[in-house]
A protein has these predicted regions:
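Short alpha-helical segments that sit at the start of domains
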Residues: 1-25
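Short acidic, hydrophobic short linear motifs in intrinsically disordered regions
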Residues: 26-38
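Residue at a beta-strand N-cap/secondary-structure junction
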Residues: 26-28, 43, 72
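Short amphipathic alpha-helical interaction segments
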Residues: 42-58
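A short, conserved structural fragment
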Residues: 57-67
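Short, cationic-aromatic polyanion-contact patches
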Residues: 67-88
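Amphipathic alpha-helical dimerization/coiled-coil segments
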Residues: 85-99
């Protein structure tokens, strides 16, 4: 089953947080990097990713650093906590089904 061209905002937020948590090593990365290195996001429009990054930043889940050439993002401590909470709830759901 192919992924739909447009993913839900919630799923997109989760995928971005997961990538920043798992792959960035605490290093800030650009929106271009996010859009090209996360397979699920390659079909998403740039303005949509920008809006989602803004939402994540407004909720203090990511931190941005603005430079003359680009804006770079990294996950915040609050974002790490939220991501781990979401993952534990997800795993709990599947463990409950299994038992």
């Amino acid at each position: 089953m192919a992924l739909p061209k447009r993913l839900s905002a919630e799923y997109t937020m989760f995928v971005i947080l997961e990538y920043l948590f798992s792959n960035s090593g605490g290093i800030s990365i650009s929106k271009y990097h996010i859009m090209t290195k996360i397979p699920e996001l390659k079909q998403q429009r740039q303005d949509r990713i920008s809006a989602i990054l803004n939402t994540l930043e407004t909720k203090d889940l990511i931190i941005s650093t603005v430079t003359p050439n680009a804006t770079f993002y990294r996950i915040s401590e609050k974002g790490k906590t939220m991501y781990l909470h979401w993952i534990s709830e997800f795993l709990k759901f599947f463990r409950d089904i299994k038992n």
